[in-house]
Design a protein with these regions (language model features):
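Short Fe-S-cluster ligation motifs
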Residues: 4-18, 29, 43, 47, ...
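C-terminal catalytic lobe of FAD-dependent flavoproteins
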Residues: 23-37, 42-45, 350, 358, ...
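FAD-site-proximal beta/loop scaffold in flavoenzymes
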Residues: 250-283, 376-450
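Beta1-alpha1 glycine-rich phosphate/pyrophosphate-binding loop at the start
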Residues: 5-32, 61-73, 78-87, 109, ...
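Glycine-rich dinucleotide-binding loop and its adjacent helix/turn
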Residues: 123-140, 198-218, 241-305, 421-436
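Local cysteine-cluster metal-coordination motifs and their immediate loop/turn environment
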Residues: 44-66, 89-110
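Feature captures the FAD/FMN-dependent oxidoreductase FAD-binding
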Residues: 78, 140-141, 145-149, 197-246, ...
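A conserved FAD-binding loop/helix module that cradles the flavin
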Residues: 295-300, 305, 446-477
Length: 482
């Protein structure tokens, strides 16, 4: 390592952001770039561990100590080579990943972890700015064809790996643009879509073909694709949202998070979305049910739309400020965090469960009846019991359901192919990422269930190796996951 005492000399710096009063008036990226000298010092805090546990936290197996040291030594072009060796899309993970690698950082045992995520993002941004990112087309073609169904991070990772291996790859996306949740689920202020588009341009130059408006299993029979292509990779994600079937669910003003986020993202893309198709929070009291990342995306969006007030509800208790005794390193630290959206305002309410939606005489939601709850163990299972005499009412005109996703959509594609599902309703696969149907593979949330973007990319890369092996009898493609 270039600076073995860096972790002693320099403390962890915080991610810089645009001022709240400025950023909530537009939809541009909220994060600011780090000064180069600051990044070099942050990279120097990587402490030359005998066993770098950051690898344990990263599903991709990123060579984190290598590129931290290269940044410290101002060798940025070498750094992007090390970074791309394990990660197709560091601009996505460097922006959107919660950084489980930092949760496993050895320095985090008794100090603040290394700013791995910030250094990663700086490397890839510098590489694009310098023109170091160029298409990497294959030396020759194999004559084999692969259809990737779904264009989220898992599908894109699989497609790029397979195209570079010489296969002719076509990505099918049911929406009108490529990107999946990266396109229409992630708000513009969190990741500007130009970041996605520049990577897609590289993939097209490498030979990947994109087909949009193609809902395989609905307007394109799955069997037709099986006849046309030598292999299929199912990367359709876990798109079925978790509902809240309580009294009043049918009221106007109660929406799934994705039904709220998608039209606004379309407007940010420049689409003409009619006012009646846009779910707007302007001038309304808003309640977001769900305390995860999707809830935070909704929170930042309602701020920019001009909500009157916002409450975000979470059924779990408020996390502690530091690790609990039963949450030791190198586990992911379950601690209280403040995202950029939370820093912009709104009230977070913990240990509550919604009892019913209350409507007015016109059939519109006007309030929520909510109860305090406490977690208890029953037969080894965590359940939430209502605290007696704890109910209260939250007035609102808009409710957003952001409680996650329960799995892939079964009608259409999965039913037509006849793939086997797990007990949790996800697509089942073998050790080579193939389903029970020969030549049909799967990766990402469709087989794992809802998860992190870093897992999706890792699974896409791993499935690509399985496909390559199936088509060619062997494969030299790397696979970070078994």
């Amino acid at each position: 390592m270039g600076k073995v005492t860096g972790f002693i000399e320099w403390k962890r710096d915080k991610q810089p952001y645009r001022p709240v009063e400025e950023r909530t008036r537009d939809w541009r990226q909220v994060m600011l770039p780090w000064p180069v000298d600051t990044l070099r010092k942050q990279g120097a805090r990587c402490m030359d561990c005998g066993i770098p546990f950051c690898h344990q936290g990263c599903p991709l197996g990123n060579l984190i100590p290598d590129w931290n040291d290269l940044v410290y030594r101002d060798k940025w072009r070498e750094a992007i080579g090390r970074l791309h060796a394990t990660n197709n899309f560091p601009e996505f993970t460097g922006t959107l990943c919660p950084a489980p690698c930092e949760g496993s950082c050895v320095l985090g045992i008794n100090d603040d972890a290394v700013t791995i995520k910030a250094v990663e993002l700086a490397i890839i941004d510098r590489a694009f700015e310098e023109g170091w990112i160029a298409p990497e087309p294959p030396v020759g073609l194999t004559g084999k064809t692969v259809a990737v169904i779904g264009s989220g991070p898992a599908g894109l990772a699989a497609a790029q790996q397979l195209a570079r291996a010489g296969h002719q790859v076509t990505v099918f996306e049911r929406a009108d643009r490529i990107g999946g949740l990266l396109r229409y689920g992630i708000p513009e202020f969190k990741m500007e879509k130009r970041v996605l588009d520049r990577r897609l341009a590289q993939m097209e130059a490498e030979g990947v073909r994109f087909v949009v408006g193609a809902h395989v299993g609905v307007d394109r029979p799955a069997e037709a694709l099986r006849r046309e292509f030598d292999a299929l990779v199912l990367c359709g994600g876990a798109c079925a949202p978790r509902d809240l079937p309580i009294p009043g669910r049918e009221l106007d003003g109660v929406h799934f998070a994705m039904d709220y986020l998608t039209p606004q993202n379309r407007r940010c893309e420049g689409d003409r979305v009619p006012d009646e198709a846009l779910v707007s929070a302007q001038g309304k009291r808003v309640v977001i049910i769900g305390g995860g990342d999707t809830g935070a995306d909704c929170l930042g969006t309602v701020h920019r739309q001009g909500a009157l007030e916002v409450h975000q509800l979470e059924i779990l208790p408020r996390p502690p400020d530091t690790r609990a005794a039963d949450n030791p390193w190198p586990q992911w630290p379950n601690i209280y965090r403040v995202s950029s959206a939370h820093a912009e305002g709104g009230e977070r309410v913990y240990s509550v469960s919604t009892v019913r939606f209350v409507g007015d005489e016109r059939g519109r939601v006007k309030a929520l009846e909510v109860a305090r709850v406490e977690p208890v163990r029953e037969g080894g299972r965590l359940v939430f019991q209502e605290v007696p005499d704890s109910r209260f009412v939250l007035p609102c005109e808009l409710v957003l359901l952001a409680m996650g996703f329960v799995g892939p959509e079964r009608p259409g594609l999965l039913e037509q192919l006849g793939v086997t599902l797990t007990d949790r309703g996800n697509v089942k696969r073998d050790e080579h990422w193939m389903t029970n149907v020969p030549g049909v593979f799967t990766a990402g949330d469709m087989q794992r269930g809802q998860s992190l973007i870093v897992w999706a990319i890792a699974e896409g890369r791993s499935a690509a190796r399985g496909v390559d092996r199936y088509l060619m009898g062997r494969s030299d493609l790397p696979a970070p996951l078994p």
